[in-house]
Amino acid sequence: FRRWYGNNHRVVKWTTGARDEYASHGGLHNSVFWGKTGVTCSKITSSTNAFRIKENNQEYSSLAPTIFPINTDDNLYRVLGVLNCKAVQQLLWVINPSLTINVGDILALPNFSDAQLDESLISRLIEISKADWNNYEISYAFTYIQLFSLRSNDSALKDHYRSLRTIWRNTTLEMQRLEEKNNRIFIE
């Protein structure tokens, strides 16, 4: 379950020969969308849907349906903020009370273009989620385990762990505050 950013753990061979092979088996998506940023989610979930940014260096699949902007003026952060709010999650459950999301479910949602979303809030949620995701060994941007990043001024592993726990707790509280603020936009 990854909201805002994450679940990027597949590496796809993307050479010309590999793309030719995928195309010969019907497994290649429309090249118009290659290298484009979008909003994606997992088609099958165990609870609520979690929408997240798909960066331009990531591909999409039928198991990760993706919304792409029609033109450069379309705001993907707005789309992401709307889809991740609790009110829309409830609407999606009413539209399709199952563990699978379909493109038609998203298209059945009302138009929320008048919602006054704070892009900086969504940007911060993505930033925090991306940093969290990249702390996992399955992330292709993973560099080191935070617990083992002792600095010379840290007196003991115990103190370093306490410090990390405080950082993690504060990050969790910030995420919670920002998500609640995003939800309030639709409640008010």
Describe these PLM feature segments:
Residues 4-188:
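S-adenosyl-L-methionine
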